[in-house]
Amino acid sequence: MGKFLATLILFFQFCPLILSDYSPSCCTLTIGVSSYHSKPCNPAQPVCSWTLDLLALSADQALQPPCPNLVSYSSYHATYSLYLFPHWIKKPNRNGGGYYSASYSDPCSLKCPYLGCQSWTCPYTGAVSSPYWKFQQDVNFTQEVSRLNINLHFSKCGFPFSLLVDAPGYDPIWFLNTEPSQLPPTAPPLLPHSNLDHILEPSIPWKSKLLTLVQLTLQSTNYTCIVCIDRASLSTWHVLYSPNVSVPSSSSTPLLYPSLALPAPHLTLPFNWTHCFDPQIQAIVSSPCHNSLILPPFSLSPVPTLGSRSRRAVPVAVWLVSALAMGAGMAGGITGSMSLASGRSLLHEVDKDISQLTQAIVKNHKNLLKIAQYAAQNRRGLDLLFWEQGGLCKALQEQCCFLNITNSHVSILQERPPLENRVLTGWGLNWDLGLSQWAREALQTGITLVALLLLVILAGPCILRQLRHLPSRVRYPHYSLINPESSL
């Protein structure tokens, strides 16, 4: 009898642990068309936590709002408190009357059209506490501006609730659903790139193998080509494999997916096969079948012939271009100097027009301020008339509009200096040097021409030489050691 009781006690102790492995491991919060998984939680670990952003929740709910014409959340509501309202499935009995309070239970459901919730339209406007929900035990939250942390007991996962910002006239609301679910499966970790070095390292060192391949390649081309090897990325390597050697059917791990794999049944190699290639998955695997050889891609280029060094003389085209540039610069300098004389008088006339426009804008701004004061008086009077209905905006069921008139732009417009002092007359960096306008323009044109001439003399011969040798470089063929179309 004692052994039976001991076995029964052990069974009831370990039974919750066994069943908890098959229970849902998280709580999923849904708003609009988006879902948020909580941290791992279950009956053994009942606290389900979320860290949410109110701006992101508003964007999610805007795709599928519970009510039309909801006022969205913005930084305007950063200073207002946030309230949480559970939605009841069963309506409890009402005891007593009066206004709703935290000790009274009544179903709080979202009704459309939603025109803004005040403190008396829902039974819970602060810490949630009722015979069904306890604020600290079942649900609690903390708010830091737009950042929201929610802790929900796992037993309450499956009930909807609402979040409300109690801002008069601006009451954004979020309607959230919760349901138990499983955490998404964790993706298997990828094989680190650093582990490929010792896995892909053959018995013969890479240095000896590559030197042997390069030596054989040079001998086959009679030392008339240059061998270029690229070992930058393992994914670009090539594979030669023998189809005569089969791959074991046991499960193996793919190590490398090469960019090119070619069968070589009758190829004579200077050394043995070092790796295992599976043709079905086109990858190097961890099985020790030794039917392949991996090598980095390398190419062949003919050795360029040595030519005589050409004489570095300035061609006639350089002098011709320099002369044309100097002539164009002088013509542009003269034309620009002549336009400065007429430009000064034009600036004076434009400055007069701007002054008259500024005076007209200032007068209109003063009239607008008077109209704004008149509208504000009427607004205050209408708010007093509709005081019992919550103000004019609540009575009209519209958003409140306000005027934002500032004097900063008008004052800046009046303080700006004359246009002639703000416009550069063509002389860069506003140098004066005590010279007249004509002398400054002539000096600037001369400096520009000298700089252009030096640039053409220094860079012109190099550019022409590169262009002259470009056709001969394009004609050089490019050979690849591994060609898919060649027969091995």
From Swiss-Prot:
Positions on the Cytoplasmic side per record topology? 464-488
Listed GO CC annotations: host cell plasma membrane; membrane; viral envelope; virion membrane
Could you confirm whether the keyword Glycoprotein appears in this record?
yes
Alphabetically list the UniProt keywords. Answer: Cleavage on pair of basic residues, Coiled coil, Disulfide bond, Fusion of virus membrane with host cell membrane, Fusion of virus membrane with host membrane, Glycoprotein, Host cell membrane, Host membrane, Host-virus interaction, Lipoprotein, Membrane, Palmitate, Signal, Transmembrane, Transmembrane helix, Viral attachment to host cell, Viral envelope protein, Viral penetration into host cytoplasm, Virion, Virus entry into host cell
**Residues marked Cleavage (site):** 312-313
Q: Region Fusion peptide: which residues? A: 313-333
Q: Explain the post-translational modification.
A: Specific enzymatic cleavages in vivo yield mature proteins. Envelope glycoproteins are synthesized as an inactive precursor that is N-glycosylated and processed likely by host cell furin or by a furin-like protease in the Golgi to yield the mature SU and TM proteins. The cleavage site between SU and TM requires the minimal sequence [KR]-X-[KR]-R. The CXXC motif is highly conserved across a broad range of retroviral envelope proteins. It is thought to participate in the formation of a labile disulfide bond possibly with the CX6CC motif present in the transmembrane protein. Isomerization of the intersubunit disulfide bond to an SU intrachain disulfide bond is thought to occur upon receptor recognition in order to allow membrane fusion.
Stretch forming the signal peptide:
1-20
Chain intervals for the UniProt region annotation (Immunosuppression): 376-392
What residues show lipidation of type S-palmitoyl cysteine? Answer: 462
Q: Which GO terms describe its biological process?
A: fusion of virus membrane with host plasma membrane; symbiont entry into host cell; virion attachment to host cell
Q: Where is this motif: CX6CC?
A: 393-401
**Which residue pairs form cystines in this protein?**
225-228, 225-401, 393-400
Mark the transmembrane ranges: 443-463
Q: Does the keyword Transmembrane helix apply?
A: yes
- Glycan-carrying positions: 140, 222, 244, 272, 404
Q: Which residues form a coiled coil?
A: 341-387, 397-429
Segments in the Extracellular topological domain: 21-442
Q: Where is this motif: CXXC?
A: 225-228
Quaternary data? The mature envelope protein (Env) consists of a trimer of SU-TM heterodimers attached by a labile interchain disulfide bond.
Question: Can you quote the domain comment?
Answer: The 17 amino acids long immunosuppressive region is present in many retroviral envelope proteins. Synthetic peptides derived from this relatively conserved sequence inhibit immune function in vitro and in vivo.
Extra facts: HTLV-1 lineages are divided in four clades, A (Cosmopolitan), B (Central African group), C (Melanesian group) and D (New Central African group).
UniProt function note? The surface protein (SU) attaches the virus to the host cell by binding to its receptor. This interaction triggers the refolding of the transmembrane protein (TM) and is thought to activate its fusogenic potential by unmasking its fusion peptide. Fusion occurs at the host cell plasma membrane. The transmembrane protein (TM) acts as a class I viral fusion protein. Under the current model, the protein has at least 3 conformational states: pre-fusion native state, pre-hairpin intermediate state, and post-fusion hairpin state. During viral and target cell membrane fusion, the coiled coil regions (heptad repeats) assume a trimer-of-hairpins structure, positioning the fusion peptide in close proximity to the C-terminal region of the ectodomain. The formation of this structure appears to drive apposition and subsequent fusion of viral and target cell membranes.
The protein, known as? Envelope glycoprotein gp62
Q: Which organism is it from?
A: Human T-cell leukemia virus 1 (isolate Melanesia mel5 subtype C)
Q: Which gene encodes it?
A: env
